[in-house]
UniProtKB/Swiss-Prot annotation:
Native source organism of the sequence: Human herpesvirus 1 (strain HFEM) (HHV-1)
Subcellular location field: Virion tegument; Host nucleus matrix
Name of the encoding gene: UL55
GO cellular component: host cell nuclear matrix; viral tegument
Protein's name according to its UniProt entry: Tegument protein UL55
InterPro entries attached to this UniProt entry: Herpes_UL55
């Protein structure tokens, strides 16, 4: 199997124009079972659950940050399939090394990004108008002290990484569009 050139990966990246700051998920998971384990936030008035879909090769406890992502100025969220493509791109080893280089720290995990879901359901007797589901990108962390200063610095670096990669995808598509126009004129 031949390696896929990074330019091709960026061309297939979904349109993501906005990555919101991280939201820490009030739960912890076991890395080995985090792919299919939903957790409920006990601190919320409404019933809020988190599904992080992390596929981690490292064992132990993880905690997560959620990034809402949008594909346009109307805050339209991308489809889950597009989010999976984006998570695969940011987890691609050469792309992930950029995050390690920016932080100056080696990550403990080869796939720290995944697609996550926050589902908020109104309490019993309340109208369904308050119910919502948000899909986005999750960054999970293995640090010893969840949501410590070091942990938040990692989440901040992850935010910058996601924004950089989404910008690179848009730039690659724009450049490809220009190349196609030039070929058509020639």
């Amino acid at each position: 199997m031949t390696a896929t050139p990074l330019t091709n990966l960026f061309l297939r990246a979904p349109d993501i124009t906005h990555v919101a700051p991280p939201y820490c998920l009030n739960a912890t998971w076991q890395a080995e079972t985090a792919m299919h384990t939903s957790k409920t936030d006990s601190a919320c008035v409404a019933v809020r659950s988190y599904l992080v879909r992390a596929s981690c090769e490292t064992s132990g406890t993880i905690h997560c940050f959620f990034f809402a992502v949008y594909k346009d100025t109307h805050h339209t969220p991308p489809l889950i399939t597009k989010l999976r493509n984006f998570a695969d791109l940011v987890n691609h080893p050469p792309v992930l090394r950029e995050l390690e280089d920016k932080r100056g720290v080696r990550l403990r995990c080869a796939r720290p990004f995944s697609v996550g879901t926050i589902k908020d359901v109104s309490g019993s007797g309340a109208s369904s108008a308050g119910e919502y589901t948000i899909n986005g990108i999750v960054y999970h962390c293995h640090c010893r002290y969840p949501f410590s200063k070091t942990c938040w610095m990692g989440a901040s670096a992850a935010l910058q990484h996601l924004r950089s990669i989404s910008s690179s995808g848009m730039a690659a598509r724009a450049a490809e569009h220009r190349r196609v126009k030039i070929k058509i004129k020639a």
